[in-house]
Amino acid sequence: MTNQDSDQAWGKLVKVDASPGSEIVLINSECTVGRKKDCDLSFPANKLVSGNHCKITHDQNSGKVWLEDMSTNGTVINMSKVVKKQTHLLQNGDVIYFVYRKNEPEQNIAYVYQSITPQESASHDVEDAGREEDSDLTETESEPAPVEPVIVKPLPQSGHEDPQPSTSSSSLHFYNMPLSTCSDVSARKNPVSSSAVCKGDSTSSGSPAQTRLKWTCWTDGEPEEEMQRKRRKTDRDDPGFGSAHSDASADIPLRGASGKEKTEGATTDKMEESLTCIICQDLLYDCISVQPCMHTFCAACYSGWMERSSFCPTCRCPVERIRKNHILNNLVEAYLLQHPEKCRTEDDLRSMDARNKITQDMLQPKVERSFSDEEASSDYLFELSDNDSDISDMSQPYMMCRQCPGYRKELSSALWICESAQSESLAKTAGDGPSTSSDSTTAAPQEFRCPPQASHLICTCCLQPMPDRRFEHLPPQVSPQHCLVCQKPFCHVYWGCPRIGCHGCLARFSELNLNDKCLDGVFNGNQYESEVLQNYLSCRGMSWRHLLQDSLQALQQGLYHLSDYRITANSFLCYCCGLRTFRELAYKYRERIPPSELPDAVTNRPNCYWGRNCRTQVKAHHALKFNHICEQTRFKN
């Protein structure tokens, strides 16, 4: 801040629902607000405030004041939201919400902007000088020896109140309490440096920027033990705080005094944000990454989340695997070596270790896919042993299923399937497939046991292994472990798929469990033709199951012909291939409905040139105007 900028104040921000003396005087031509520590008005402990939330700019020529939003959540001015990269002309009396929560008013951070005329600014400076002079006289009587000033940073507020913002010392002034009260509190806390805290610029002989600093003391009448606890917490968050109290005569670099220091602080903040867990909002500890999205969290934090949801906390992508992120763990360790004050306490570390429910078995690689068109090879599951010594038994199979000797259930359960849900699903579907394998906890004998080094398949739905028994069926293409069309393996027919939400990933075509929405957009996304078919079925008390059975009967009689001649009513199809074949049969069924059984509005439409291949039939107007249950008649190769 130059001397020219500091000649007079042009505005001030008064905090809503605060003490009458709590105000922020704006002097610089540009004032920044955000969570970063180098902002003029900083809220470092409030995660609802963006790093660079907004900036308030004063035009010295026109005298106008503008607020430009740079945040993610936006800024609310007079109950009107200003989003990112938008500007708003501030008027005297405008209420600015840096944080606005309609259902959580205690989280709101609101200030009232008040413009200051040059006359008011001059009188304000005279009043400040009077306060400083009175403070100098009082401190001279009690402490004649000059002491270097010490900055006392604000202590965090207790309860649910908003954290008091820390401000840039070169642009903003706080008047939170009478100076006499500040002197009493400082003398009680630290008698050596009490006079320097409240004395202001009378004892400082430095640059003009230093001369205009007004040190502020903060207190809320709490007991000594509570104040000391909060001070220790502040020491961990800010390395400069502890050093300022330990040595009152140490030189304290002012923020903004050197451009290099400001750049280094911004870089440090960026690194800290990159190494912060979004769940606990602290530096990562024993971090893990979820796949396939690769977002990273503390192991203890994600353990609690994993019990409630199977989706990623950041992007809501389904989590398939969990892995240790060794690179980020090393980066966090290196960062803490340079910033030891940011380390967690021993109690926090012990608590996080106790809450960590991610076992070593969950971190082992579960699936390694290997697709080959030349070989009829399957997917392989690698079960890595905890013992890395040379005496480990290399003759063990790379994967284990329920029918392998030595199978243990807890080593094979999918990461996103709860143990109780899996047990319930296995018990319910124990007799669905040809295998009579039961839960590993029961003593019932099993008909099939995997031989050593047996080949296994990985279910496409639940990603769990099962024995490869395709060649026990002749021909192997009709195996109940594969879809006839896509040839992908599924375990539902074999022993029941345990994935939550699976209603039959593989079944005979006649027994396929399609839901009631299978008729929506059944004709290449043509909603109008789909509604015509649904109305026709509902008027006759029929559902999609009746349509499927009638179509399969016509297929068996040779009335219908599918593009894949291999498909019959007894063919094993996965859900996707079965739905695609069902839509093909639905078109055949709709095509054979007599026009006399359909409304006149349907039968009186002309045929579209493109017929069933029309790409415009998804538009409602075009679908209503033309009939698309016909073959293409123009531009046909």
Swiss-Prot record:
Residues 120-172, 193-267, 428-447 are annotated as: Disordered. Residues 258-267 have a biased composition (Basic and acidic residues). GO terms for biological process: cell division; mitotic G2/M transition checkpoint; protein ubiquitination; ubiquitin-dependent protein catabolic process. Residues 31-82 form the FHA domain. A zinc finger (RING-type) spans 277-316. A zinc finger (PBZ-type) spans 606-628. Residues 193-210 have a biased composition (Polar residues). The keyword Iron does not apply. Residues 429-445 have a biased composition (Low complexity). It is an enzyme of class 2 (transferase). Its EC number is 2.3.2.27. Residues 130-142 have a biased composition (Acidic residues). GO terms for cellular component: nucleus; PML body. E3 ubiquitin-protein ligase that functions in the antephase checkpoint by actively delaying passage into mitosis in response to microtubule poisons. Acts in early prophase before chromosome condensation, when the centrosome move apart from each other along the periphery of the nucleus. Probably involved in signaling the presence of mitotic stress caused by microtubule poisons by mediating the 'Lys-48'-linked ubiquitination of target proteins, leading to their degradation by the proteasome. Belongs to the CHFR family. This is E3 ubiquitin-protein ligase CHFR. The lineage of its organism: Eukaryota, Metazoa, Chordata, Craniata, Vertebrata.
